């Protein structure tokens, strides 16, 4: 049966509204799998102390500050100044040193061959993906590694469903694992690997319970803003309706 019911509840939400919601609430684990997946990745693929790491799309800085606590030299970039401001507050509260930079993943203010590792958590989808991947390659040192956790399309969908999902999230396209691999290879990455094709989580509640964020960075009165809860409700309803089309994976690749 082909599913064509794609109207978003209460009239729909756009990219700015969804990303604004995350910014205003100061969400530190919005990526698929949450902070638990971040911890698991760092256990499974440890980064050596002293490595120079770039986190792209750092948000409120939870991952960046955690890595800094482990003795890693971290630079973190985000396109939204309000996110960088909150990330700096987190770094101060957790007493760690992170270089935070406001900037675009598609045009990063770093020299070639600068970083040993690039960490990305559900950011490339929101950028011009191939352009961002080319930038990751440019600023990595030879032998440097890319770790990028992104949403993937795991089941073919109608164009209307694809359009509705892309419109809500503010992305141009939802890529399959094969399409991500082709993109990485076209950007000159080698040794491309994927860790799983996990079901898309229908809620962040479990991760928030298991890994509560000790630093609260929500805007004042944000929890009383009806527009935020409108977008939150739209997110829940959209994910509940179409989650079977989506998954997520950790992509790993090397600049040789």
What are these regions (language model features)?
Residues 2-48, 62:
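Conserved class I S-adenosyl-L-methionine
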Residues 25, 151-171:
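Short, glycine-/aromatic-enriched active-site segment of Class I SAM-dependent methyltransferases
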Residues 54-56, 60-107:
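Class I SAM-dependent methyltransferase SAM/SAH-binding core
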Residues 106-117:
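A short acidic, Gly/Pro-enriched loop at the edge of an enzyme's catalytic core
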Residues 117-129:
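A short SAM/SAH-binding and catalytic strip from SAM-dependent methyltransferases
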Residues 130-145:
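A short glycine-rich, Lys/Arg-flanked "PGG" loop and its adjoining helix->strand segment in the class I
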Residues 172-188:
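Short alpha-helix
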Residues 195-256:
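Conserved Class I S-adenosyl-L-methionine
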């Amino acid at each position: 049966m082909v599913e064509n019911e794609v109207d978003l509840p209460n009239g729909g939400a756009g990219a700015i509204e969804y990303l604004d919601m995350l910014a205003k609430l100061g969400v530190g684990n919005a990526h698929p799998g949450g902070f638990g997946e971040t911890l698991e990745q760092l256990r499974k693929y440890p980064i050596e102390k002293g490595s120079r790491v770039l986190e792209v799309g750092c948000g409120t800085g939870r991952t960046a500050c955690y890595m800094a606590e482990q003795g890693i030299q971290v630079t973190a970039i985000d396109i939204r100044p309000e996110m960088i401001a909150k990330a700096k507050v987190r770094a101060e509260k957790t007493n760690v040193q992170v270089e935070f930079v406001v900037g675009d993943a598609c045009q990063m203010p770093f020299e070639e061959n600068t970083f040993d590792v690039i960490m990305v958590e559900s950011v490339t989808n929101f950028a011009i993906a191939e352009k961002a991947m080319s930038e990751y390659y440019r600023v990595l040192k030879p032998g440097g590694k890319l770790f990028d956790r992104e949403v993937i399309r795991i089941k073919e969908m109608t164009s209307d469903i694809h359009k509705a999902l892309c419109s809500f999230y503010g992305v141009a396209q939802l890529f399959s694992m094969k399409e991500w691999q082709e993109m990485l290879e076209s950007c000159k990455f080698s040794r491309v690997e994927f860790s799983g094709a996990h079901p898309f989580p229908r809620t962040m509640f479990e991760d928030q319970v298991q890994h509560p964020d000790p630093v609260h960075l929500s805007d004042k009165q944000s929890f009383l803003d009806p527009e935020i809860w409108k977008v939150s409700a739209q997110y829940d309803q959209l994910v509940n309706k179409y989650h079977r089309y989506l998954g997520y994976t950790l992509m790993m690749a090397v600049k040789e």
